[in-house]
Design a protein with these regions (language model features):
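Carbohydrate-interacting regions of secretory-pathway proteins
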Residues: 20-422
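Positively charged n-region of N-terminal signal peptides that target proteins for export
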Residues: 1-4
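Bacterial N-terminal signal peptides
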Residues: 7-16
């Protein structure tokens, strides 16, 4: 009996110890701001460099600043894991610019490039992603002009400050979504990430860089979907900054020109779309509760197009969304696509939901106005001043807005959002 009791007692100790170990490894979800760098020491951090080198030569702390020489390659990481947070860091190049990165959801053993999702810190490339160690996410899976090798390029122009000036890099990690913001501008989005928690690393990768004011905070007040409080120009009249171009199987030709470059272009304040092959441009940002204004005209024989509201999931030709139809003579119809739903005339619909009145589109070559109101789950479509369709209980009710390529040449201009109360 005594031997049995002793064995049982030891088993309880082992189990308790195992539980404690698992508890220590459990990812922290911040409920308040957690300061990660105290400005004086490396408390709460683990340093790692290639070949087991002298970390004291790579990383130092002085005057409230965490300084990195950039050599040899490696990183400094949090000792603890985190999930569902916003990571905040201020940074500046201490001399010559170069390469760096923020690794989120780092798991596994310490090595120079551990399994993680890198939010690129390279000069003029901040906001790119690098997949490290087999991390999967939607935007990497679809390949195309933005996804080359392990890299997924940022949305558009950089938003970095001049070398020597302090910039702000924030990374929002919410569930399977990762969003990097550089000086307040959304630079990219990774969705359905295979990793949703882990340690956070600041890289040493080539050039001297300094960090300060490092913390994580709760992600309960995420900055998306954006609800307009003033007019938002979605199209700047000059280029497609703020938009993502999508064509399936997007490939470069012999002149290294990608398919999306042939389908979409901008001249004289107008977005031109060839209509073939099928695809769309979509806003980088997600929106909810707004008035959308779009002007369109057929540049050739009129065929088909549409405004896709609140695209959800992975980019594909017909994603989950509510389509405000632009097919010639059918503008104002709804098409509910990809598993989306909408209540129309009292019935939950999937597929087609016809407009109320005969077509009031203008002749091909003339500009038309599309005014769309999205208010919670309510959606109303007005063509050239005439209310053509209404629906309620839309799912999804927020997300990016897309303009389709689906048939023949079409043009768009004056694309903007306004608040509902205007």
């Amino acid at each position: 009996m005594k031997r049995t009791a002793l064995i049982l007692g030891m088993a309880c100790v082992v189990l308790a110890g195992g539980s404690a170990a698992r508890g220590e490894d459990k990812a922290i979800q911040p409920t308040e701001k957690i300061v990660l760098f105290d400005g004086k020491s490396f408390d709460g951090w683990v340093r790692h460099v290639r070949g087991g080198g002298d970390v004291e030569k790579t990383w130092t702390v002085k005057d409230g600043v965490l300084a990195c020489t950039g050599r040899p390659p490696g990183y400094i990481r949090t000792a603890k894991s985190y999930k569902n947070y916003v990571f905040h860091v201020e940074y500046r190049w201490a001399g010559k610019t170069g390469n760096n990165g923020i690794l989120v959801h780092m798991v596994g053993q310490d090595r120079v490039w551990p399994k993680s999702l890198e939010c690129q810190g390279m000069y003029r490339n901040q906001g790119d992603y690098f997949e490290i160690g087999g991390v999967e996410f939607n935007e990497h899976k679809i390949k195309g002009h933005r996804a080359r090798g392990r890299r997924v390029a940022k949305y558009g122009q950089h938003n970095e400050k001049k070398p020597g000036e302090w910039g702000v890099y924030e990374v929002w990690c919410v569930g399977g979504t990762v969003r990097p913001y550089v000086n307040g501008k959304l630079m990219n989005e990774a969705t359905d990430c295979s990793l949703t928690e882990g340690k956070i690393c600041l890289q040493s990768e080539g050039a001297p860089i300094e960090f300060r004011n490092i913390y994580v905070a709760p992600a309960d007040k995420k900055p998306w979907p954006v609800v307009p409080t003033k007019k938002i120009e979605l199209f700047n009249g000059k280029d497609l900054d703020g938009w993502v171009r999508f064509i399936p199987n997007d490939k470069p030709d012999k002149d290294k020109k990608w398919t999306v470059d042939k389908v979409w272009s901008v001249t004289d304040g107008v977005i031109h779309c060839t209509g073939k092959p099928h695809g769309y441009i979509r806003t980088c940002e997600s929106y909810a509760n707004y008035k959308l204004h779009v002007e369109w005209r057929w540049a050739d024989k009129p065929t088909n197009s549409g405004v896709l509201l609140h695209r959800a999931g992975i980019d594909r030709v017909w994603p989950k969304c509510v389509e405000a139809q632009l097919m010639h003579q059918n503008a104002g119809d709804f098409w509910i696509i990809g598993g989306a739903t909408l209540k129309h005339a009292g019935t939950v619909k999937k597929g087609h939901a016809a407009k109320k009145n005969p077509s009031n589109e203008k002749a091909p070559g003339q500009w038309n106005n599309y005014d769309i109101v999205c208010d919670g789950g309510k959606v109303a479509l007005t063509i050239n001043g005439l209310l053509q369709n209404e629906g309620t209980d839309a799912d999804p009710s927020s997300g990016p807005i897309c303009l389709q390529s689906e048939g023949s040449a079409i043009e768009f201009r004056n694309v903007y959002l306004e608040p509902l109360d205007k």
